[in-house]
Amino acid sequence: MFKSLTIKSNKVKPREENDENKQDPDPSNQPQQSTRQGENKSENKSLQTKMTPVTFEESHAKMQDKISEKNSLRDLTTNPNHQHPTESKGAMSEQKEMETGKEGLVSPKSKPLGVPVINEYADAQLHNLVRRMRQRTMLYKKKLAEGDISSPEASPQTAKPTAVPSTQESNAKLKEEHYYHILCFKFQKMPLTEYLKRFRLPGSIDSYTDRLYLLWLLLVTIAYNWNCWLIPLRLVFPYQTPDNTHYWFITDITCDIIYLCDMLLIQPRLQFIKGGDIMVDSNELKRHYRSSTKFQLDVASVMPFDVFYLFFGFNPVFRMNRILKYTSFFEFNHHLESIMDKAYIYRVIRTTGYLLYTLHINACIYYWASDYEGIGSTKWVYNGEGNKYLRCYYWAVRTLITIGGLPEPQTSFEIVFQLLNFFSGVFVFSSLIGQMQDVIGAATANQNNFRISMDHTISYMNTYSIPKNVQNRVRTWYEYTWDSQRMLDESDLLCTLPVTMQLALTVDVNLSIISKVELFKGCDTQMIYDMLLRLKSTVYLPGDFVCKKGEIGKEMYIIKQGEVQVLGGSDGAQVLVTLKAGAVFGEISLLAGRGGNRRTANVIAHGFANLLTLDKKTLQEILVHYPDSEKLLMKKASVLLKKKAPATETTPPRKGLAFLFPPKQETPKIFKALLGGTGKAGLTRLLKLKREQTIQKTSENSEEGGGKRREYEDKEREPSEKILDSSECRANCIIAEEMPQSIRRAALPRGTTRQSLIISMAPSAEAGEEVLTIEVKEKAKQ
């Protein structure tokens, strides 16, 4: 222990001596250490010259740090076995440089002579801990300088880069690549892939609303009609020759391609309804199409019987199966009629086409029969002159329509053929004529109903001898109503539709008009929809009164078409304002109370006006289900009524010094009734009666007093009573003269000052008046 103390005392020596005692066992490192020691000496000298003066506490703390560093360095030199195996010579040299740098901050004169060690083991452990921490710090510093350090914790896995930026960059590059310049202008050319995306077929097709599908059906219908009309023609008439066979073949191949595309690409994508749900799944759509009869007919219509051309020649009979694709033709007719405004026109054209096609087939059969019998062999067959098709078609028209005038058949074949032709002609022609009648009748059904209604009305007016001017106005109303809306009552049309469809139609037609009404802004949307369903359309002729001044208002009017004029003025003929389409009037009458729902002006139709009306009863039925909207409407109605109320009369301006005196307030009505119209005299009389009642009450309470006191009071009151009686008599006379006959009976008689009075008021027979009644209560006899 003593040796350790003597060793520690050696640390008081200067830095240079201590460094000389430390020598590296490796002689090769001695020159390096000497050079470093020289550098440390020069640094210490420079630091000592530049050191600023410090306090005693700061110098003492620095000395303590230096002593601990010296102890750790002593352990390293005396116990080389405790050195960390991973420590390098470079780290030791850097540590020495740091220690020498710290020594330079303290002058040798300020170093303490020695510090006693209390516990050698604890001191050694602390020095060992400090040494290891410094070694580790130096190691990490070195790795940080080299850039090889990494966190001891596992770093999180980096997410895979998304392909969105790359695709966006690629799209931007593609767009830049497809720009081309012409002169000083820059144009963009869309790439081929963008064009192809436009023609990509959707996963499912709605056959009821998709117009592109309707165009496709038109193409399929054209191909179908080509086969229906020209296959029989080419089969019978000699119009297909070896010279033009390639043209017919190209057209046939085109029609077959259309058939195949429809069967493989379009039909398997058509949506259908299953259990009320619209099916859009591709597998389900394909399964449904393959299990339908339409698929079987489509497959039969594209069967490649054309291969028999190789064995039997180019004969159109092998293409007869193309006529089996009739389902697409009828589907096209159905969808086209559903989107046309006047579908009956197309129905007439289609029925006419059926008739022409029947005549076409009959003409082909007649030419085949003539060829079978021999052209020109008899008078009945075709003689071979003129255009073959036109002559045969003419014969078919005269035969089917049973016009007659044709040559008589000669052979049995001709007779049987003609009989069958007559029977089929009568059947086909009658059915087509009947169908044509149905089409035309359905197209004119509404007009027929209008004519029937108008005829019944005119018959009624003639029966009761209605004036001619009224009849003319009724006829005008019928004609204008039919010309404007093609029906007499719109509700008859809407009543056949469900409520949701009615609401959809009325919202599109009338919602923009009803939303302009200030009274209904802020109300429940569902309440507005219910109102739209209850609106009624009414047509007014020029000069008709929509409403008159003073009548009870029960309806609100919305101008749908036309104009109306509001009349007023002294004579009631001055046009105050002209209301046009979209204007609303009469809305206050729907919610006003008694006395506030009368019309304030005359409103007439300037021309033909179509108005939407909503009556008060209907609105009340609607508001039962919407209490919040009802409260809001009541508030708005009260505000609108106040705005439209007539302004109160303004008092004339005061002149002179009259503004210094406030205006005299009006006497309340109750006081006027009590006074009975006598003014101040009546008020004096009432006060006197009140005073007498109080005196009478006090006299009754003081009955215990002696009779002498009563006699004395009676004697004193006699002269006063005489004065009162005389004054009351004069007052009563004045009141009787001023009061009307109905109130004069209520005057009090004389000599009732000591009795109790009962004053009451009752309504008079005249409006706005009340009668004051005063009853005298008789005193009970003792």
From Swiss-Prot:
Q: Which reaction does it catalyse?
A: Ca(2+)(in) = Ca(2+)(out); Na(+)(in) = Na(+)(out); K(+)(in) = K(+)(out); NH4(+)(in) = NH4(+)(out)
Q: Where is the composition biased (Basic and acidic residues)?
A: 13-25, 57-73, 705-724
Region feature Cyclic nucleotide-binding domain, mapped onto this chain = 525-641
UniProt-listed SMART domains: cNMP
Please indicate which residues carry the site annotation Central gate: 429, 433
Q: Which UniProt keywords apply?
A: Cell membrane, cGMP, cGMP-binding, Disease variant, Ion channel, Ion transport, Ligand-gated ion channel, Membrane, Nucleotide-binding, Sensory transduction, Transmembrane, Transmembrane helix, Transport, Vision
Q: Give one Pfam family, short name only.
A: cNMP_binding
Name its GO BP terms in alphabetical order. monoatomic cation transmembrane transport; visual perception
Which residue ranges does the record annotate as region Selectivity filter? 402-405
Predominantly, its location class is membrane
SUPFAM superfamilies for the chain: cAMP-binding domain-like (SSF51206), Voltage-gated potassium channels (SSF81324)
Quote one Gene Ontology molecular function term: intracellularly cGMP-activated cation channel activity
Where are the annotated segments for Disordered? Answer: 1-111, 147-168, 692-724
Task: Give TM regions.
Answer: 214-237, 245-265, 295-312, 316-330, 344-366, 389-415, 416-440
Q: Where is this region: C-linker?
A: 445-521
Q: Where is this region: Ion conduction pathway?
A: 343-442
In the record's own words, the domains note is: The cyclic nucleotide-binding domain (CNBD) comprises three helices and a beta-roll of eight beta-strands from CNGA3 and CNGB3 subunits. Upon cNMP binding transmits the conformational changes to the C-linker domain of the S6 helix to open the ion conduction pathway.
Tell me its family: Belongs to the cyclic nucleotide-gated cation channel (TC 1.A.1.5) family. CNGB3 subfamily.
What disorder does this protein's entry note? Answer: Defects in CNGB3 are a cause of cone degeneration (cd). Cd is characterized by day-blindness and absence of retinal cone function. This autosomal recessive disorder occurs naturally in the Alaskan Malamute and German Shorthaired Pointer breeds.
Q: How does it assemble?
A: Forms heterotetrameric channels composed of CNGA3 and CNGB3 subunits with 3:1 stoichiometry.
This chain's protein is named Cyclic nucleotide-gated channel beta-3
Gene that encodes the chain: CNGB3
